[in-house]
Amino acid sequence: MANDLFNSFMTGPDENGRFGDFGGRFVSETLMPLILELEEQYENAKTDESFWAEMNDLWTHYVGRPSPLYFAERLTDHLGGAKVYMKRDELNHTGAHKINNVLGQIILARRMGKTRIIAETGAGQHGVATATVCAKFGLKCVVYMGAHDVERQAPNVFRMRLLGAEVVPVTSGRGTLKDAMNDALRDWVTNVRDTFYCIGTVAGPHPYPAMVRDFQAIIGKEVRTQMTAAEGRFPDTVIAAIGGGSNAMGLFYPFLDDKEVGIIGVEAGGKGVNAKMEHCASLTGGRPGVLHGNRTYLLQDDDGQILEGFSISAGLDYPGIGPEHAWLHDIGRAQYVSITDVEALEAFQLCCELEGIIPALEPSHALAHVMKIAPDLPSDHIICMNMCGRGDKDIFTVAKALGFEMGEFA
């Protein structure tokens, strides 16, 4: 594998589902047969022209791909340095990148004869995407969501229920994404016969990290084509926010072997990366461990217990990160930084005022880092950030943070 990696950063995972020291398949004996069946089905689908024909048709006519590549002219002028482009994946059907992956997994689930789909969700976007595709195909849908996230993402909870999904509030732990994923895994163990677990990020046991990455890679593939058409070359830097890391991996992966393209992932810095762990910056402030079926960087205490972390963004409020990101971090191919809640809120407001785009709090973190670095870069430097979600779901959270009074969602 070392020789392969010398030539390419795109060959992982290996036959054991590992990216260097990260990844793998740490699951119960009950789940192992289903995991192996899923791996076999996906390996077959990857070379099946009919599978990709169905995917491409749905991406085009149901999701609305390709999503636009947008030159943020006023933001660029305001920052006074690099040219800033936005990959507008918030314009997808359901308002985020999540549906890119959900379509692929549910097509696989149907091929496997599964009739019940379960999912975890934090910001609610993966839950909405899963409920949407289940409604389209007539499948039962159950979404696990932390009770704290149910409160701060009320619009998406209502959307999921409108789409026919059962939303299960999870009260264990701090009631966030980690806890929702724990309960979804418990459900899967007891309902393996008819149930498919549609994971929303590039985490979990192999083959999920690679499979989700491959479905999301449509983002970066489109950017390669679109940026070449717009500028005659690839961007100098690509930037994306990271919770588990699926939108980022989707943008990054097609550029991994283009050494001239800088790659920056932006983690949730919460109240600041400090010993109190009031953040969700696993790479910046964590260390390796095992969670949800894979080895990766995690927020842990001295005894190895998983900590809760904190972020204003429900979609970034996860104490781990996808194993491929952990590997890219360790080998130095990608740089990972953190942005605080305050910085993300500033970027949120600036994007609204200058570009007429209301971003989700997740990509607001990436945009905040763009605002930090763009002024010091030359005017011919091209940055492409992934606008991975729209901000409708976050207006109540932002209003509260900024001190505005709003009526309760009804």
From Swiss-Prot:
GO terms for molecular function: tryptophan synthase activity. It is an enzyme of class 4 (lyase). It comes from the Bacteria. Its EC number is 4.2.1.20. Signal peptide: none annotated. Its cofactor is pyridoxal 5'-phosphate. Coiled coil: none annotated. Pathway: Amino-acid biosynthesis; L-tryptophan biosynthesis; L-tryptophan from chorismate: step 5/5. It catalyses: (1S,2R)-1-C-(indol-3-yl)glycerol 3-phosphate + L-serine = D-glyceraldehyde 3-phosphate + L-tryptophan + H2O. The modification N6-(pyridoxal phosphate)lysine is found at K98. Keywords: Amino-acid biosynthesis, Aromatic amino acid biosynthesis, Lyase, Pyridoxal phosphate, Tryptophan biosynthesis. GO terms for cellular component: cytoplasm. Tetramer of two alpha and two beta chains. NCBIfam families: trpB (TIGR00263). The beta subunit is responsible for the synthesis of L-tryptophan from indole and L-serine. Belongs to the TrpB family. This is Tryptophan synthase beta chain. It comes from Roseobacter denitrificans (strain ATCC 33942 / OCh 114) (Erythrobacter sp. (strain OCh 114)). The lineage of its organism: Bacteria, Pseudomonadati, Pseudomonadota, Alphaproteobacteria, Rhodobacterales. The gene is trpB.
